[in-house]
């Protein structure tokens, strides 16, 4: 799949789930389940409830995503 096929959206982490999964509320109000990208896992980026994140979704399943960036601050 080409990189252009992904949908990038901003959201807020509202819940932490087991196995580095998170429940994220997107800007449009939808709630998705997201996991951490491999690069964030490798660099030990910590994600807590309330953090602002960027989530990458595929057009095939809009209920699951990948957290690709945690905003500073």
From Swiss-Prot:
It is found in: Cytoplasm. SUPFAM superfamilies: Nucleic acid-binding proteins. Its main location: cytoplasm. GO terms for cellular component: cytosol. One of its GO terms (molecular function) is ribosome binding. It comes from the Bacteria. Coiled coil: none annotated. Pfam families: eIF-1a. The keyword Lipid metabolism does not apply. Residues 1-72 form the S1-like domain. Keywords: Cytoplasm, Initiation factor, Protein biosynthesis, RNA-binding, rRNA-binding. The keyword Signal does not apply. Component of the 30S ribosomal translation pre-initiation complex which assembles on the 30S ribosome in the order IF-2 and IF-3, IF-1 and N-formylmethionyl-tRNA(fMet); mRNA recruitment can occur at any time during PIC assembly. Belongs to the IF-1 family. One of the essential components for the initiation of protein synthesis. Stabilizes the binding of IF-2 and IF-3 on the 30S subunit to which N-formylmethionyl-tRNA(fMet) subsequently binds. Helps modulate mRNA selection, yielding the 30S pre-initiation complex (PIC). Upon addition of the 50S ribosomal subunit IF-1, IF-2 and IF-3 are released leaving the mature 70S translation initiation complex. HAMAP family: IF_1. This is Translation initiation factor IF-1. It comes from Legionella pneumophila subsp. pneumophila (strain Philadelphia 1 / ATCC 33152 / DSM 7513). The lineage of its organism: Bacteria, Pseudomonadati, Pseudomonadota, Gammaproteobacteria, Legionellales.
